[in-house]
Regions:
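Alpha-helical transmembrane segments
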Residues: 1-22
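Short extracytoplasmic
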Residues: 23-43
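Short acidic amphipathic segments
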Residues: 41-56
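The feature marks short, hydrophobic/small-residue-biased sequence motifs that occur predominantly
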Residues: 56-62, 66-116
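Basic-flanked hydrophobic alpha-helices used for secretion and membrane insertion
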Residues: 61-65, 106-195
């Protein structure tokens, strides 16, 4: 794994910012997720400081990741989530950041703080080895995806780390395909924008 942020701050182009909706107590109590309406997105896109606007697309299916061999005590399984942003906002090697429709391997960009949490919190308390960024790129990941209509198992590979964005990113093409196939009865709402 090559840390793409070594050229600057991260894999993202430096002129972009992430905008999120405020979480309100009333939404929490009602079980609602804060999201931008179409009118809010249209209004935001007309602001003079916005040249381009993209939406974060959340997975409409459950994600479980298995790393290593949990049965042999050499790995673990965890719940995860995926989000996607339009590829034009990702300043990464496109030969690594691509997904072929119908493919069986998902390239992933992880937040660097997740690796730090694993190394300095989880691994140290569980007697597991610390992992470098390069090592994570060599680790075999199995993703188990469970939607409302279908399930799927896929391989995964970490292709970069980010210091600037706090989500688990997958290519937009994969997200569109997986949401449509696994949970066609659900429609993703944008809780964050990239501008």
């Amino acid at each position: 794994v090559i840390p793409f942020f070594s050229r600057g701050d991260s894999f993202m182009k430096e002129t972009y910012a992430v905008v999120g909706k405020r979480v309100l107590v009333s939404q929490t109590l009602a079980g609602d997720t804060p999201s931008f309406t179409s009118a809010e997105i249209a209004d935001f896109s007309k602001q003079p400081f916005v040249r381009r606007l993209g939406k974060f697309t959340p997975a409409q299916f459950d994600v479980f990741a298995s790393i290593g061999n949990a049965q042999a005590g050499l790995g673990f399984t965890t719940d995860m989530f995926f989000e996607a942003i339009p590829d034009r906002y990702v300043d990464a090697d496109l030969s690594k950041w691509n997904y072929r429709l119908g493919g069986d391997t998902i390239p992933v960009i992880l937040p660097k703080n997740y690796l730090n949490l694993y190394n300095f919190g989880f691994a140290s308390t569980k007697g597991l080895p610390a992992l470098s960024e390069a090592m994570v790129g060599m680790v075999q990941i199995r993703f188990y995806l469970r939607g409302t209509q279908q399930n799927r198992q896929m391989a995964g590979r970490v292709v970069a780390f980010s210091d600037r964005i706090n989500t688990i990113l997958v290519p937009q093409a994969f997200m569109n395909e997986a949401n449509a196939a696994l949970s066609p009865d659900r429609h993703p709402l944008a809780s964050r924008l990239i501008v």
